[in-house]
Amino acid sequence: MKKIVLIAIVIGMWPTLYGQQIMTTNGGAPIGDNQNSKTVGEYGPVLLEDIHLIEKLAAFDRERIPERVVHARGAGAFGYFESTKDMSSYTKAVLFNGNNKRTDLAVRFSTVIHGKGSPETARDPRGFAVKFYTQQGNYDIVGNNLPIFFIRDAIKFPDMVHSLKPSPVTNKQDPNRFFDFFSNVPEATHMITRLYTDLGIPKGYQYMNGSSVHGFKWVNENGEVTYVKYSWISKQGEHNLDLEQAAKQQSVDWQHATVSLRMDIDNKNYPQWDLYVQLIKPKDIGSFDFWPLDATKDWPADKIEKIKIGTMTLNKNPVNYFQEVESIAMSPGNLIPGIEPSEDKLLQGRLFSYFDTQRHRLGANNQQIKVNQPKKEVVNYNSDSYSSASNSKFPNADINYQPSTKVALKENSSYKLSETKLNNIKITQKKISKTNDFAQPGSFYRSLSEKDKTNLIRNLKGDLGQVKNIHIQKKMITYFYRSDRDFGMRIAKALGFSQKDFMQFGK
């Protein structure tokens, strides 16, 4: 009898002795058997009253949320930004208005077109998104590794993505489809030129630069506006893979970028990026041979100085990928006082689309997910929904509306948005007049080394050479020729066109 009691005591102490926790249902009740369903007899059938089985299957059935329509494959990390230059004369944004000021942040790097399980060796732009947890709310810079984009107007974005995604018929990404689209979008020439260099396949996320792509507005305490564009410069250097290196890497480990980033942080080789800004006064915005608020245009450093304002350090890996990376909700509309959107047509569409896709993907309460919560207490009149604030925060809990004779919450007029005066402006629907689609891709091409030019031509030939429609090929070559004569001639020759053919359609 003593032996039986002793065994019972040991069994009862088992979870404590070996540091194991008792498994529970979602309601917190302990589970007796997680290996066998409740059945009629030894062989079944299974009883519907097996609540644990039903709950377990129901939870599993709903595990997968919609993946991002673009930027589905990604990696994330946490760290901080430390300012090194006081920019308060340009912006009242709290993270930029002092020296040696630290702001916690989260970062998500990503590929763009393919799904969550796709290789990180594909030629693709890379997403470079940073969420700053400031004392005045969350501020997101949602950009890419390249300083420009394919299009300048958000109305083209769904069509562009459709062309780059796999065919709805064959489920295969097809150069015939996306070059058909781009042959009718000359503004894409700049982005295509950059993407088909080795920049299109970064060696790892920590080895790529980043850009806000768009210009934004900085606003200071006096309400004065300055246009700003951000650049992240990797302190690890910018390193990429050519075709052979990418093929070799893919044969060994096609998720190398995620693994490399995580290993560096685990090994305390913390990746860093310096943050630079370029500034343009509103009175100077029209003085360039391009429109600076056109997302297909870079801001040349020899014309618009790059000013270092701080450094980002990543020093912490996610503990739970789904909760901290898959669930992070980035948006260029997450702005704080001192930073406002510009008139950039592509940016204007993104301000809506990012918030909208997060509501679809993560639900109405996505900003209450821990990784998306601001440090600043959220206090507003959202009521009776997942997005509502707790009324216990209010001096008058009964008041959830404005205006009211009982002041529960108040605004601060110092945070009002800047004003813009417009004269002789009409509402219209047409493309901008200052397109200048070929000057910058030409300048970029001429800045390349001979090796980089050779790789660019080879990479373009690989995809453009698959296009069956000769007229599409000719239109693309025409764009490259108009950018730079040598560029056009070399790709024409690579695709098998004669000098006579080339000179005829290259004019």
Language-model features and meaning:
Residues 4-13:
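Sec-dependent N-terminal signal peptides
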Residues 15-19:
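Sec/Tat signal peptide C-region and signal peptidase I cleavage site
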Residues 20-507:
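Active-site-adjacent core segments of small-molecule enzymes
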